[in-house]
Amino acid sequence: RLYAINPKHATIQDQPAYKSIEEIGARVEMAVIATRPQTVPQLIEQCGRSGVRNVIIITAGFSEAGHIGAALERKVLEIARSYNVRILGPNCLGIIRPELGLNATFAKITAKAGNLALVSQSGAMCSAVLDWAKANDVGFSSVISIGMTADVDFGEILDYLIYDSRTHYILMYVEGIRNARRFMSALRSAARIKPIILLKAGRHEAGAMATATHSGMAAVSDTVFDAAVRRAGVVRVQNVGQLFYAAKALASKFRPLGNRLAIITNGGGPGAMAADRAGDLGIPLAQLTNETMAVLNKAMPTNWSHANPIDIGGDATPERYRDAIMAVTHDANVDSTLVMLSPQVMTDPLAVAKAIIEVADKLNRSLICCWMGEEQVREARQVLEDAGIPAFRMPETAIELFHHISKYYRNQKLLLQVPSPGRQAAGGRPGSGRVLVDALIAERRRVLSRMEAHALLHTYGVPVRPSMVAHTATEAMFVAEQIGLPVDVHLESPDLADAFDEQT
């Protein structure tokens, strides 16, 4: 049920309005605040007294607005925490959960149900994605605009989405991070389970200044951020268009096994453009095996390109496209196939699309399509997309999309990599570490002392702070002078280790 609250009006859109949330007299699960910033603290107080534990603050004018706004934000958080109230925002669009029929935003349009989750710091970006999604028939499990992340942040949202059965893929728009440790921990955990596509603003100085003004957060080094999210297994895109197309691909059946690409085309020019963009992005074109070449030589006209890109001629029929696809899908050197079509005089774009759909489920490789043009190929593109096969207008777009999605699966493999047992860090002596561990095992020890732990780390080249053992206060003073002040003092005793062992 929805309750309207406004002290100045008796009704709002023909619904009765209450002067305060305390007048409702029924349990309220969530409140949405869209009033002047100065009124927010007292409204949070009222929510707390009424037992409301979840609040969305759409209102702007807090930490992003300077010192006065930041002080107001701190006051809001202090009151909220005293009542155990959680806050999404402030300065956010709100949240949409299509499956629940929940639209707690001021967006003009809502989202259809689907398996994509969108998490964004920018409400304007959410509105743009929603508009694009409606035109492209893309659905969402959740659309979450988190705004200034004064309380609930990226980390907690990601932790929730990991276990949300309706969410299969996650799209993120990021401007700044308040808690880097929590963000990276949640990001890494989520990316192990669900594909994450991330767009971050502020890559350059002007953009960083703009995001700092908008989000009220200090910019971080883009190089450091990029390396961190890549190691977490996340795919980072560079612009809004790539985010849209990645969303489109994730909602389809496209699952590349690797990044070795075969290109099938009915025109040399489009094939060359696709190959060039692949080269820009470091995507290797698959080297076709002798067996594949023999099959193609038998099935294609004599003037086919005899190389990858596989130009099958401007008069290519649906059957010729099908034969070319079937030939490369059994090639061990091919991970995925890009099928391109230019609407030439002898081409039937719709018939070719239908032929591809007929064999798509029989393939052991993923397909992505590029039907170039507009009027003559519009229906064919839609037919492909309805069948779960991504279809694009331009070869560069298709290649970029393939790059980002294949990079996700490649990043997942990196997450599983561990250093080999024989790998030795600079300055390390792994053999000495093995001797130490064997000695401890022989003593039936389960806990290392601090000095033993430091010694073990040192043998593997891991930097540790210098440590020394002192048996008396005088020795401790002497050791401290040797190490240099200030120093940390810890008790070193096997009895303490045994006690800890028993407790655990």
Where does each model-flagged region fall?
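Catalytic-core regions of core metabolic enzymes
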Residues: 1-504
